[in-house]
């Protein structure tokens, strides 16, 4: 089974100072995983050109199928993703006419003039395709470089989600053939350390990702969410493996004195 790797780059000082929770990374990771990609790395960098350049170049050197970034596409002085991406790819920046028309249409409806700051949101690496942003103003930037699809999205979560979905629907034609499935259940009364060796055995037996997520306290009233996940080109086959592992894990949990409280 061929693995299609993906990487995520989040750009913004506000993430690194802890002011903003990085919900964008989790949303993109879930979305890409649902499409069959394996997200290999999530990188967070400051709003600094050299940091942005380094993040893109390092990701490109690892040769993922797709790189998605968030943040830095707005009109302010510290929005530098377009410049950083262009420098990382050694491609000149240009005023993208399609993106500029998108901006003109949005601002003209409100009788707002296009300033240099607003015009900046249409400046992209040469050869880029602007991706519509129906939840805001700044369009996403789509470019294919050395066979790697790169999508830069805004940092505002609603705008990022809109641009991401527009990209998936309109432009992401070549996708992994694998199907990712997962399920989970809650087990009460069994310590994570007690069930750990059984989980290890089942991971090897079924070739699945099985993860215990503690929801209670190990030494008082332990509650575990047990996640079972896997990928395969054969959906029926992966469903069967997950179901067998699920049933076996529940049996083990009960034998260890636990109670299934949610399945």
Swiss-Prot record:
* SMART domains per UniProt: MoCF_biosynth
One matching Pfam family is MoCF_biosynth
Q: CDD domains per the record?
A: cinA (cd00885)
Superkingdom of this entry's organism?
Archaea
List the InterPro entries hit by this protein, alphabetically: CinA (IPR050101), CinA_Arc (IPR023055), MoaB/Mog-like_dom_sf (IPR036425), MoaB/Mog_dom (IPR001453)
NCBIfam families registered for this protein in UniProt = PRK01215.1
Return the similarity comment: Belongs to the CinA family.
Official protein name in the record:
Protein STK_14130
Q: Which organism is it from?
A: Sulfurisphaera tokodaii (strain DSM 16993 / JCM 10545 / NBRC 100140 / 7)
């Amino acid at each position: 089974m061929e693995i299609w790797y993906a990487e995520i780059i989040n750009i913004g000082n506000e993430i690194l100072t802890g002011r903003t929770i990085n919900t964008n990374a989790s949303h993109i990771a879930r979305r890409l995983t649902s499409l069959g990609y394996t997200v290999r790395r999530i990188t967070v960098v400051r709003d600094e050109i050299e940091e942005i350049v380094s993040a893109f170049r390092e990701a490109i050197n690892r040769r993922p199928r797709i790189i998605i970034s968030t943040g830095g596409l707005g009109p302010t002085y510290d929005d530098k993703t377009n410049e950083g991406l262009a420098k990382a790819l050694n491609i000149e920046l240009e005023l993208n006419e399609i993106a500029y028309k998108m901006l003109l249409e949005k601002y003209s409806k409100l009788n707002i003039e296009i300033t240099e700051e607003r015009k900046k949101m249409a400046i992209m690496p040469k050869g880029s395709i602007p991706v519509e942003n129906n939840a805001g103003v700044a369009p996403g930037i789509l470019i294919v470089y050395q066979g790697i699809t790169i999508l830069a999205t805004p940092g505002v979560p609603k705008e990022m989600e809109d641009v991401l979905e527009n990209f998936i629907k309109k432009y992401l034609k070549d996708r992994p053939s694998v199907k990712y499935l997962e399920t989970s259940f809650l087990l009460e009364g069994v310590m994570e350390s007690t069930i750990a060796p059984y989980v290890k055995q089942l991971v090897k037996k079924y070739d699945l990702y099985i993860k215990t997520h503690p929801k209670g306290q190990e030494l008082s009233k332990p509650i575990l969410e047990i996640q079972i996940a896997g990928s395969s080109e054969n959906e029926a086959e992966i469903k069967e493996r997950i179901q067998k592992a699920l049933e076996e894990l529940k049996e083990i949990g009960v034998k260890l004195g636990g109670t299934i409280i949610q399945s």
